[in-house]
Amino acid sequence: MTDMRRLGQRAKQASLLIAPLSTQIKNRFLSTLAKALVDDTQTLLAANQKDLANAKEHGISDIMMDRLRLTSERIKAIAQGVQQVADLADPIGQVIKGYTNLDGLKILQKRVPLGVIAMIFESRPNVSVDAFSLAFKTNNAIILRGGKDALHSNKALVKLIRQSLEKSGITPDAVQLVEDPSHAVAEELMQATDYVDVLIPRGGAKLIQTVKEKAKVPVIETGVGNVHIYVDAQADLDMATNIVINAKTKRPSVCNAAEGLVIHEAVAARFIPMLEKAINQVQPVEWRADDKALPLFEQAVPAKAEDFETEFLDYIMSVKVVSSLEEAISWINQHTSHHSEAIITRDIKAAETFQDLVDAAAVYVNASTRFTDGFVFGLGAEIGISTQKMHARGPMGLEALTSTKFYINGDGHIRE
C-alpha cells in the first residue's frame, strides 16, 4: 500500500469520526486553535525562515517571497480568521426545505458534510490553516498538499493543528499533510476516488490546468486571476487612479490583483498620463499597451497577444483602449479568468449593464478588486475563490464545503 493510500484511508476514517461533532465542540476547538497559533508564533516563524532561506537560494522573486512569508501580524490575521470561522453559524444540519408530499411522506433537505476534501496549493502557508478551519467547521476531513517551497511552514502548521486536535480528544487524522512534493504523489491524490470526495486546487494557471487534465475525483476550480479594471467614459478619474494603484500595487502577487486595464477612448488621453504620474510615485509599473494606448504613455512597451491572457503576479499591467462599453464588456469576457472584474463609472446604467453582462464570480462598481476575499466578504477564512459555476462560485466559505441529503420519514408507506 502506498503512503498516499494510507493517508486517504486515515482521512476517510477520520471523516466518519468527526461527522457527529456538535457545533459547540467544533467552535470550542477552533477558538483553542486560534490561541495556539498566536502562542506558537515563534516556532512557526522559525519554520517559515527555513522556507524563505531556501527560496532565496533558488532565486525566487521578491514578490513570490512575499506570498511565502509569515510574520507575527500575518499569523495573528490567520488566527483571527480561525476565530471568525468559529463565530460563524454552522451550516451542518441546516434545513434547506421541509414538506409533506402527496403520499404523506415527511421530507427534509439538510446540509451535510462532503466527507474528505483534498487541497493542492502553492506557496502561501496560510492556506493550510484556512482550509482546515473551514473543513473542520463543516465536519469534513482534509488532505493538504502544499508546494515544496512552503514545506517547512506547512509541516509546522499541520503539526500544531494535529497536536491541538489530540489535546482536545479529537482524531488528529482530521487533517493530513502530503509531505512528498513529487508530481507522482500529487497525481495519485488527484485520482484517489476511493477516499477523496472533492479536490480543490489553488494556485497558478499551470497547476489548475494539470489538475483539470489529470484528476479523476470531482474538482472545484479556483484561483487564476486575470483581473481587469474598466475605466468608463463617465469615470471619476481621480477615483479611477486610486483604485488602479491599489488593485495593481498593494499586493501584486495575489489572485485578486488587477492585471489588465481597459480604458474608454473618450478619457484615455487624460487618464493615462495622470495614472502614470501618480503610480510612479508609489511603485513604477511596466505597461504593456495596445496601439491606441502606447503613444499616451511616457514609458511603455507594445503588448503582445499573450500579455492580455497573462496573470502577471508582478508590477506589470496590460492596457487596452476601447470605443464603447459594449466593446469593453466583450473584450473582458474574451480574456477573463472569471474571477473578479471592475468598472469605474458615474453612469448608473453602464454600471448595471457591466455587472449583468460580465462573466465573473465578483463584479465591482467603483471599488478595487482586492476586496474579493472570504474574510472581507464575512465568510471567514476562505478555502479558495471558485471561478466555475458549479458547485460553488466566488469566495468559498462554509456552505461551499457542504452537500445536501434528503431525510424521508414515513409510517409504513409503500409505493403502488
Curated annotation (Swiss-Prot):
Reactions performed catalytically: L-glutamate 5-semialdehyde + phosphate + NADP(+) = L-glutamyl 5-phosphate + NADPH + H(+)
Superkingdom of source: Bacteria
InterPro entries (alphabetical): Ald_DH/histidinol_DH, Ald_DH_C, Ald_DH_N, Aldehyde_DH_dom, G-glutamylP_reductase_CS, Glu-5-SA_DH, GPR_dom
Biological processes, Gene Ontology terms: L-proline biosynthetic process
EC number: 1.2.1.41
Source organism: Streptococcus pyogenes serotype M5 (strain Manfredo)
GO cellular component, one term: cytoplasm
Pfam families named among the record's database cross-references: Aldedh
NCBIfam families recorded: PRK00197.1, proA
Pathway in which this enzyme or protein is active: Amino-acid biosynthesis; L-proline biosynthesis; L-glutamate 5-semialdehyde from L-glutamate: step 2/2
Enzyme class: oxidoreductase
Protein name (database record): Gamma-glutamyl phosphate reductase
Family the UniProt entry places it in: Belongs to the gamma-glutamyl phosphate reductase family.
A GO molecular function held by the record: NADP binding
Keywords from the UniProt entry: Amino-acid biosynthesis, Cytoplasm, NADP, Oxidoreductase, Proline biosynthesis
Entry function: Catalyzes the NADPH-dependent reduction of L-glutamate 5-phosphate into L-glutamate 5-semialdehyde and phosphate. The product spontaneously undergoes cyclization to form 1-pyrroline-5-carboxylate.
Localization of this protein: Cytoplasm
Main location class: cytoplasm
CDD domains: ALDH_F18-19_ProA-GPR (cd07079)
